[in-house]
């Protein structure tokens, strides 16, 4: 049987010094025979999705210790993409994913931890910890801080979120008082932003991957039911330790759970729920850490066959994550996919022998278990707070309407093709991605003239000064992982296009990426990126570009000869922005840029350069 990794620092006379230090942390004689379980917390007062996590690591620790383990907590960094957005701070967001992954690896390996509990929540923290867990391949459970409650105001008859505040702020017809009212109401509680944005998308995907417990992605941060998820995470990691160290059960390890089939399940869910395009970036990166050959081609293949069964903000104003929970949560969607034979139900999870068994237990349509029904009735209280587990509101009934409800069955899908698509063409030879769930059907085929910007800042200035007119395709380049560096999110440009009434009359194409809050004909992750010699760097003002989502195509309408001529010309002067940028790029960001791959590889480090 495998020995505890921690034995390296706890066993033998020569480890007396290490044990002396362990004792200084509070360990006793009998603790040296127990598994040492690392708790990777991500508490910070900078991020609403993490502001309530301070004491939750110790909640898990006490449960681990009660059940015979030794718990040791540490913290990672966490960047708030919304606060970092619109200025040079966004350059640091995606690179922080690698820092988080490395920091978890460093702590777990430096101290020979036997297992891991990841307390994550927001945009790059869950992906970074996911990458680390698959890299380490020790028993691991994920538990998130949970989603924020949606906001409410008398100015609108629908719920609010962060994007509403951003769009209204750029609307010249809105008064300062209206903007202030929405600003104060859009983000009322702690938790990750309330729509199907990147953070919530990733926390939902950990359920499909099998690495977190049911409800992880959908129980709001303020609800008392989430406390039980944290306690159960402590119990589950102890069980996983017994299964691996006591019985050498490989399905207790992240790589034994997150197999190729599990990654197919995750992207199938992603497509069905119209998740953030960032999830593609992060799943590709995680798959590489899992040593799974999961690529853009696999995503393209699945996107053609999976319908959209759930539509949530920003793709609609009707539903937020709290409504998904009321409709049965992620297992409600997984159950419908399973009924359509679109899932691998024989894969393992941290909490059930197979995903199929878990679906049978947690599907509100298929089970009569009152405890399960009660669990999915957990709702929001509408009381502004930064305190976790502070309310116990329950919906009077579940949303079991699979015809017109938040979650649909296969027959009544929101669309027959899913919410994410991969496009290819002469300006995205290795692919680019679009969240079709947020694109109006009238512009699934769109042709327009290019208006090229060499930075997000220039594009924002151009949009706000009315340079962008109906029928144009805004091209923002040199914003990829290497060229930015850091692959900035383009939520401000897309929000401002909406504010100008151009959401259905223009498109945006970039080698950067988009916030999970983005909707509209916004196509990102163009690969190769401009800084790596990608053809997006060859587009000129006035070029006609044709986007054809049904055919999964995007092309600039010029001859191959002209494209080749431009390539030679660009190669001679170097792949860099035509206009100089005032952007301050630190040595840390330069180091990231030197190793960064394009988005089709997950923007991970190019290991061939190491």
From Swiss-Prot:
UniProt EC number: 4.2.1.9
GO cellular component, one term: cytosol
Reactions this protein catalyses: (2R)-2,3-dihydroxy-3-methylbutanoate = 3-methyl-2-oxobutanoate + H2O; (2R,3R)-2,3-dihydroxy-3-methylpentanoate = (S)-3-methyl-2-oxopentanoate + H2O
Domain of life, per lineage: Bacteria
InterPro entries named in the record: Dihydro-acid_dehy_C, DihydroxyA_deHydtase, DiOHA_6PGluconate_deHydtase_CS, ILV_EDD_C, ILV_EDD_N, IlvD/EDD_N
Co-factor binding comment: Binds 1 [2Fe-2S] cluster per subunit. This cluster acts as a Lewis acid cofactor.
Cofactors: [2Fe-2S] cluster; Mg(2+)
Keyword terms: 2Fe-2S, Amino-acid biosynthesis, Branched-chain amino acid biosynthesis, Iron, Iron-sulfur, Lyase, Magnesium, Metal-binding
Binding site for Mg(2+): 81, 123-124, 489
Subunit note: Homodimer.
The protein, known as: Dihydroxy-acid dehydratase
Gene source species: Xylella fastidiosa (strain M12)
